[in-house]
UniProtKB/Swiss-Prot annotation:
It comes from the Eukaryota. It is found in: Cytoplasm. PANTHER family: TYROSINE-PROTEIN KINASE. GO terms for molecular function: ATP binding; non-membrane spanning protein tyrosine kinase activity. This is Tyrosine-protein kinase SRK2. It catalyses: L-tyrosyl-[protein] + ATP = O-phospho-L-tyrosyl-[protein] + ADP + H(+).
Length: 362
C-alpha cells in the first residue's frame, strides 16, 4: 500500500510513503516552480496522478512499485447527536458503564454506552478532585478544540458526583499501557510516527494558545493501526488536591515537568515541549519511567546543574538531539510543536540523493 501526503516541512512538496513488508519507506516528491512533480529529475510528471500511475507500472528506483492506495484509518469525528454539539451537559442516566479500562490518580476510565447504542469512554473524577463549575467552564473551551489527533470531548455529567467526562473510545487504551504490553514489538519508524502524531495534536493546541500541562504517555490514547490522540488536555490546572502541588505533592509528575513549571508554576506551551521530550523517551524505552533510580528531588537538583537524561540505547543521535532541543534551559530556545511535527514526520523521508538506495533504508 502507499500514501501521498502534503509535506509539513516544505509546503508545496509532498511525501510518498510505501509499505514494503513490515517497513514503511518514505520519499520526497518535489514540485517545480514552472509546474510538474518529481522524485528524481530524470522522471518529471505534469500531475501527481501521472507520477503515481508511472510508479504503479514500474518501481524505477523505489523499493517496490506502487500497488493499492492506503485506506483511511480513522473514522471522521462526530458528536453523540446534533443536540450535544452545543449542549455538552447530558443526563447521567443516558450513560451505561460496561467495563473498567483503567484507573489513575484522580479517577477511573470505563468503556461505556450512550443511550445504549453509541460506544464511548467515560472518565469518572473522584469527589473533590475539581470544582464542577470550573470544569464546566473549561469544557466549553475543550469542546471547541477539534483535531484528528485530539481526543474529542463529547459531553459531561457534572450534576452530582462523580463528574463524568464522555469522550470518543480508543481501542488500545493509554500509550503507556500499550508500550508496556503489545507494542513491545514496534520498531523505531512506528514509534517515531506515533511521536509525530502527538506533536501534530499539540501543534493544534499551540496554534490555539492552549496548554496541556500534563503531557505524558499515560495521557495519550491509542486506537487501531497505532493511531495516537492527545487526551486530558487542560485538566491538570483544575485539580484542587493538595497531593497535586508542584513543590510537595506526592502525585505531581515532576519527572515529566519542565523546571520552570515545577519550581515556579510557570506553565506554557514551552513547558509542554519539555514534557514532549520526556514522552519520546517513554516511546523508545517502551514505557520506562524517566530518570530511573532518581527521586523527584534528585531530578530537580540534577537538572539545575545541567544534567539531561543520556541517549537511550539504540536511539539515533538525530532523535536524541530532538529530545535535547526540547530540554533546553531557556523555554524560548525550545522548538515549537509545529517544528517538532515536521522534523518527526520527515525523519525518514528520502531526498533524491538517497533515492537510488531506498531498499537499504530502515
Amino acid at each position: 500500500t502507499f500514501l501521498v501526503r502534503e509535506s509539513e516541512s516544505k509546503p508545496g512538496d509532498y511525501s510518498l510513503s510505501i509499505q514494503d513488508g513490515d517497513n514503511v519507506k518514505h520519499y520526497r516528491i518535489r514540485k517545480l516552480d514552472e509546474g510538474g512533480f518529481f522524485i528524481t529529475r530524470r522522471a518529471v510528471f505534469n500531475t501527481l496522478k501521472d507520477l503515481v500511475q508511472y510508479y504503479q507500472n514500474e518501481s524505477d528506483g523505489l523499493c517496490v512499485n506502487l500497488r493499492q492506495p492506503c485506506r483511511p484509518l480513522e473514522r471522521p469525528q462526530i458528536d453523540l447527536s446534533h443536540k450535544t454539539k452545543d449542549m455538552w451537559e447530558i443526563s447521567r442516566d443516558s450513560i451505561t458503564l460496561i467495563r473498567k479500562l483503567g484507573a489513575g490518580q484522580f479517577g477511573e476510565v470505563y468503556q461505556g454506552l450512550w443511550n445504549n447504542s453509541t460506544p464511548v469512554a467515560v472518565k469518572t473524577l473522584k469527589a473533590g478532585t475539581m470544582q464542577p463549575a470550573a470544569f464546566l467552564a473549561e469544557a466549553q473551551i475543550m469542546k471547541k478544540l477539534r483535531h484528528p489527533k485530539l481526543i474529542q470531548l463529547y459531553a459531561v455529567c457534572t450534576q452530582g458526583e462523580p463528574v463524568y467526562i464522555i469522550t470518543e473510545l480508543m481501542s488500545k487504551g493509554s500509550l503507556l499501557d500499550y508500550l508496556q504490553g503489545e507494542a513491545g514489538a514496534l520498531k523505531l519508524p512506528q514509534l517515531i510516527d506515533m511521536a509525530a502524531q502527538v506533536a501534530a495534536g499539540m501543534a493544534y493546541l499551540e496554534l490555539h494558545n492552549y496548554i496541556h500541562r500534563d503531557l505524558a504517555a499515560r495521557n495519550i490514547l491509542v486506537g487501531d493501526n497505532n493511531i495516537c490522540k492527545v487526551a486530558d488536555f487542560g485538566l491538570a490546572r483544575l485539580i484542587v488536591s493538595d497531593d497535586y502541588n508542584a513543590t510537595e505533592g506526592a502525585k505531581f509528575p515532576i519527572k515529566w515537568t519542565a523546571p520552570e513549571a515545577a519550581l515556579f508554576n510557570r506553565f506554557s506551551i514551552k513547558s509542554d515541549v519539555w514534557s514532549f521530550g520526556i514522552l519520546i523517551t517513554e516511546l523508545v524505552t517502551y514505557g520506562r519511567i524517566p530518570y530511573p533510580g532518581m527521586s523527584n528531588a534528585e531530578v530537580l537538583q540534577n537538572l539545575d546543574k545541567g544534567y539531561r537524561m543520556p541517549c537511550p540505547v539504540t536511539t539515533p543521535e538525530s532523535l536524541y538531539q530532538i529530545m535535547l532541543d526540547c530540554w533546553k534551559r531557556n523555554p524560548a530556545d525550545r522548538p515549537t510543536f509545529e517544528a517538532l511535527q515536521w522534523r518527526l514526520e520527515d525523519f525518514f523521508v528520502l531526498d533524491a540523493g538517497q533515492y537510488q538506495h531506498a531498499a537499504d533504508v530502515l
